């Protein structure tokens, strides 16, 4: 699949590897076929997932409702789906 895949209907799915309890929220580039994202939130009671979705939405200039977690709720490796942005725009906004 690669780290990013266009879906029928215009949405984009991509894989991320989350590092919780980091010193700041940031995108660190590609690591092992996934986008590495560092988050300050701890991996407790869904806090890191919520912070991840909010951070990705803000980074892409989207509303939180346009970003959803598709797979990996309890894993560091997650698959997200976004609407309202092209694959090319996604790469540019993440500087990949």
From Swiss-Prot:
SMART domains: DUF167 (SM01152). GO terms for cellular component: cytoplasm. InterPro entries: DUF167 (IPR003746), YggU-like_sf (IPR036591). Disulfide bonds: none annotated. It comes from the Bacteria. PANTHER family: UPF0235 PROTEIN C15ORF40 (PTHR13420:SF7). Belongs to the UPF0235 family. NCBIfam families: DUF167 family protein. This is UPF0235 protein Helmi_20270. It comes from Heliobacterium modesticaldum (strain ATCC 51547 / Ice1).
């Amino acid at each position: 699949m690669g780290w990013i895949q266009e879906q029928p209907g215009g949405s984009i799915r991509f894989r991320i590897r989350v590092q919780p309890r980091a010193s700041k929220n940031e995108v660190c580039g590609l690591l092992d076929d996934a986008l590495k994202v560092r988050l300050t939130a701890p991996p407790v009671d869904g806090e890191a997932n919520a912070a991840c979705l909010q951070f990705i939405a803000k980074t892409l200039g989207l509303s939180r409702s346009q970003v959803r977690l598709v797979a990996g709720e309890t894993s560091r490796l997650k698959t997200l789906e976004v609407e309202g942005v092209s694959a090319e725009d996604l790469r540019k906004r993440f500087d990949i």
